[in-house]
């Protein structure tokens, strides 16, 4: 059960099962469904609106510097995260469910990423994609017999800027990529500037359910 509050011409959805979801947002599990609302001696039947995928956004920005003088070479820098909607509720729940002595580790934005750097003969291969999102969860396409359901509709943005030391030049960047299906979109872009590389990835899940026949393409 949940509560609908009407205040100053606006409607707020209060659901105690989502401790950290702002009242302006509606849990995706009940979006688009009909609700019976008490209205004095009568009642109202309302259809709860369905919000866009962008209402639940997770944006993660990394700013690195390639450290060629460390052993092993590494990407060192900081991370900044901004989340909204159900994604924000998920992260806040994760934080508060973590033992207090470990909560500080979750808030640490200092990154030292050695796994993203491979070197040989004075050349460096950098992996800009952080690879942590729904799109990288493995799905067994050979034995699965049912549709696959993603956690929620959302928009995920990953941006990575890597500062390159003087004396080095970018010799290769992957081609940009964009694909769009009924379930969502995935796009990646790379560009090089004066002394830096910039990577941007946008993933938008518009429909949570992936039909069994479409799983191999996904």
Model segments located where?
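A sensor for short, sequence-defined functional sites
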Residues: 1-218
């Amino acid at each position: 059960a949940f509560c609908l509050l009407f205040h100053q011409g606006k409607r707020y959805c209060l659901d105690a099962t989502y401790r950290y979801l702002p009242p302006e947002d509606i849990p995706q599990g009940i979006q688009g469904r009909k609700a019976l609302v008490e209205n004095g001696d009568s009642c109202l039947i309302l259809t709860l609106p369905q919000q866009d995928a962008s209402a639940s956004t997770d944006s993660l920005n990394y700013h690195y510097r390639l450290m060629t003088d460390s052993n092993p070479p590494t990407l060192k820098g900081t991370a900044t995260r901004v989340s909204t909607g159900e994604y924000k509720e998920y992260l806040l729940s994760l934080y508060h469910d973590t033992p207090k002595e470990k909560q500080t580790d979750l808030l640490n934005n200092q990154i030292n990423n050695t796994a993203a750097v491979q070197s040989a003969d004075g050349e460096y291969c950098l992996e800009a994609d952080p690879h942590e999102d729904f799109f990288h969860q493995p799905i067994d396409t050979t034995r699965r017999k049912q549709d696959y359901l993603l956690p929620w509709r959302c928009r995920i943005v990953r941006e990575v800027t890597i500062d390159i030391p003087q004396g080095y030049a970018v010799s290769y960047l992957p081609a940009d990529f964009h694909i769009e299906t009924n379930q969502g979109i995935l796009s990646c872009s790379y560009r090089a500037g004066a002394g830096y590389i910039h990577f941007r990835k946008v993933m938008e899940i518009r429909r949570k359910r992936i039909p069994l026949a479409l799983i191999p393409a996904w």
